[in-house]
Amino acid sequence: MMSKQLAAQVPAEPVVLGKMGSSYGIRGWLRVFSSTEDAESIFDYLPWFIQKAGQWQQVQLESWKHHNQDLIIKLKGVDDRDAANLLTNCEIVVDSSQLPALEEGDYYWKDLMGCQVVTAEGYDLGKVIDMMETGSNDVLVIKANLKDAFGIKERLVPFLDGQVIKKVDLATRTIEVDWDPGF
């Protein structure tokens, strides 16, 4: 059972850093999928929270290790496969105050999601629905508007600051780009 003190703490500004995968073994270990730039960085941001039945719960990381290509974790109080299975697909959440401050021109992916993307000429390319890592640079995945003049459903626009990305305004949730709407 959780103590009242832990139950009272909830993330003021929740940020999803990953999710728990399937159980591993019989002692309550779980695979973990990290969406941090460096997978192991997920362990730098504690405490973790999960939502179960609409309620926030703080979970305590007891241990973690590499297993083949996976990262596996052991949470305090999760001691068998059944308990671990209950956590499969739970998102791992931290409070945004745990994250490091960003430098000028850097953005968290979560802040770019849902932003409207427009060209310098004012053409509305659509909304950011996802981000991809390509190795050389990140790429915005933009869902085009239903009445897109070019009949495009989805656009991939490289997140190259200055070159393609002209202005990011998180207050108005818009990203101005130098990009040909035909692509």
From Swiss-Prot:
Q: Name one Pfam family in it.
A: PRC_RimM
Q: Can you supply one Gene Ontology CC term for this chain's record?
A: ribosome
Among InterPro entries, the record links this protein to: PRC_barrel-like_sf, PRC_RimM, RimM, RimM_N, RimM_N_sf, Transl_B-barrel_sf
Entry's localization field: Cytoplasm
Its keywords, alphabetically, are: Chaperone, Cytoplasm, Ribosome biogenesis, rRNA processing
* SUPFAM superfamilies linked: PRC-barrel domain (SSF50346), Translation proteins (SSF50447)
Specify the PRC barrel domain's residue ranges.
104-183
Q: Which GO terms describe its biological process?
A: ribosomal small subunit biogenesis; rRNA processing
Origin, by domain of life? Bacteria
Gene Ontology MF terms in the entry? ribosome binding
Q: How does it assemble?
A: Binds ribosomal protein uS19.
Job description of the protein: An accessory protein needed during the final step in the assembly of 30S ribosomal subunit, possibly for assembly of the head region. Essential for efficient processing of 16S rRNA. May be needed both before and after RbfA during the maturation of 16S rRNA. It has affinity for free ribosomal 30S subunits but not for 70S ribosomes.
What family does this belong to?
A: Belongs to the RimM family.
Entry comment, domain topic: The PRC barrel domain binds ribosomal protein uS19.
Q: What name goes with this protein? A: Ribosome maturation factor RimM
- Organism for this UniProt entry: Salmonella choleraesuis (strain SC-B67)
**What is the organism lineage in this UniProt record?**
Bacteria, Pseudomonadati, Pseudomonadota, Gammaproteobacteria, Enterobacterales
